[in-house]
Structures are given as structure tokens and as C-alpha cells.
Amino acid sequence: MTASTSVAVGCAVGIPVGVGIIIAVCFWFNLQKRYKREEQDDRELERAIYDESGFVSFDNFGPLRDSKDEAALASSELKNPDHTSGSSEGSAHPEEKDGKSRDQEKPLGKKNSKYYVPAYRRKINLLQVRNNNYGNNARQKSVVDLPSINNSSNVSLSSSQRHITKRQISVYDQMVPVISDEGPKFFADPSSDTNTSNDQNKASMIELKHNTRQSSNENLIRKLQNQDFGSYYPRRASSSFLNGNISNASFHTRNSSITSVNKRDALEDVFATPKSAAQSQLPNTFDKDNEGIDADHSVKDSRSAITDKDKNIYKLQNNYDVGNIGEIAEEDQYENEFTNYSQSKREFIESLRPK
């Protein structure tokens, strides 16, 4: 009874555990195979990446074509019997030659390489093969059209191409140089007439740039002069009794209290309650002809002060004295020597002018 129980427990526990271990070992072997395959693919990809001739190539351009291709073309021309044969071979139909070139193009295009080649590179290779075949066909047609007398010269020319030295072209040899228009011309003849015209064009371009820069500065100065950077508060209607020392530009850009000619001897508190009966401490700068007008204003101010005292009503009109409206030009109460907008504006405009 005990033996059967132990066997049953061992089977119930051991069989699932053994099956699980076997499955885990199978998965581990598959994973190791996958890792090896991926490592091999990575090595091939790195090999293809570091292969300079596989990715960086300008062989489809005539001036930058590799010398190996030229040597291969020369050897194929030597092996081709069309060059050495006479008029009997030259009378062959061109469609047969086109068929041969197509048959040669297919194995070149579909040739499997041990390196990984992207799709765009395959297209470039196909275009390159087609261009080479087209060049071969053109050369063959030109040779066929020549008389048979010149065949010996063609053979000697092709035999001289055997001695072409094969040189391995690196990435630095295949880079296209880019030279800017401005500056010295390294590949130009200094004694040619084109250089003189280029120098004249260059001088005219420099002068044009200088003129455009100067005109743009002048336009900026005009725009800045027409703007008022210090007007943050609404202005009162100007009076006809303004002081003659204040210039007309004060209507557009108000002068600072520091630079003003008419300054108070003792500065008043502008935040105090305005009193219409307060007399101005400014010195009288009007002419003798305006003394009668000042007397009339003083009478009106005294009458208004009496009415304000009788009514005992507070009227907040401005932070300035209402009685001397004809003597005070409106100024920004927050403008001082540190926030002198008009002076800063003038200095900035002067800095823009050409010196």
C-alpha cells in the first residue's frame, strides 16, 4: 500500500516536472540557435557597412567612375570579337546584340551576394549595369561603322588599355568637392578675363549689400522716430499757454523732468490730495504782454477756491494742480533719470546712424 502511494506521488510530481524541464531545454537550444544566427547576421551587416565600395560609390557618374570598371570594360572589349573582325561581323543585326546584353544584364542584376544589400542599392546597381551596357553598345556601334582599315588602330588602342594601373579608391577620393562662390578661385586662371569680371561682380555685390544694410538702418530710424515708447497714460488737451522753452517734439515724445528747463525749486508730493488753491512755485517766464492774462487766471483760481471751500466737496482730477494748467506741460510722474524713455530712445537712434 505504501509503495503504491509513493509511486503515485512520484508520478504525479515527477512526470510534470520532467516534462517541463525537457520543454525548457528545447526552448533553450532553440534560443541559442537563434542567438548564433543573429550574431552571424550582425557580423555580415557590419562587414557590409565597413565595405567602402559597397555603399559609397559614384560609379554611375562618368568623371568619378572607378578605374576597376574601366579595366573590366577594356578587357571585355579585348575579348569581344566584334572589334577584331572585319565587315562580315559588323553586318550582324543590332537586335541580336541587344538580346545578348539583356541576357548579360539579368544574371548581374539577380546575382546573390553574401553581404546584405538594401533595396535602394540594388536599384542603383541595376541602373549602373544598364548604363555600362548602353555605353558598350554605343562603343560597339561606333566601331562597326568605322572602315575595316582602322581595325588595327582599335586593337592597338585597346591593347594599350591593358596597362591601366588598378588603384583602390577610398571614401575620401569619391567625395564631391563643394566650393563657395565667394572667396578666391583655386581652379581658375588668374590671367583670364573671367576673373576680372568676377572681381567686378564681387565688388558690386559687396557695395549692394552695404547699401541695403544702410537703407535698412535708415528705415529703422524713421520707424523709431515715429513711435512713442514713453506714453503709457492718456494725455490732456494741450493749452495755448505753454512755455516757449518746450519744443514741438514734446507733443510726440515728452521731455524728462530732469532735462526740463522749468523745474520746481522744492519738489511737491504728487500723491498728495490736489488743492486748486495751491499756488505754483514755478518762476514766471512769460513776457510782459501776458501779465494781464495771468492776473485773470489768478482771479478765477481764487473764485474756484472759494466755491470749493463753501461746498466742501473733494474733486480728484489729476495729480497736478488744476490752477496752473497754463504753466505746466504734462510729464510722466514715474519718469526719472533711471527711466528716461525719450533720452534712451534718442541714444538708441544715434547709435544706429552710420559713423
From Swiss-Prot:
The regions listed as transmembrane in this protein's record are: 9-29
Show the GO cellular component annotation of the record.
Answer: cellular bud membrane
UniProt lists compositionally biased (Basic and acidic residues) regions at: 92-108
The membrane topology noted for this protein in its Swiss-Prot or TrEMBL record is: Single-pass type III membrane protein
The segments annotated as topological domain Extracellular are 1-8
Residue positions where Phosphoserine is found in the record = 142
* Segments on the Cytoplasmic face: 30-355
Location of the protein in the cell: Cell membrane; Bud membrane
Q: Which domain of life is it from?
A: Eukaryota
Where on the chain is Phosphothreonine found, per UniProt? 273
GO BP annotations of the record are: cell wall organization
Instruction: Please indicate if the UniProt record lists Transcription regulation as a keyword.
Output: no
UniProt key word Nucleus: no
Q: In which family does this protein belong, per the annotation?
A: Belongs to the SKG1 family.
Function, as annotated: Plays a role in cell wall integrity. Affects the cell wall polymer composition in the growing region of the cell.
Protein name, entry field:
Suppressor of lethality of KEX2 GAS1 double null mutant protein 1
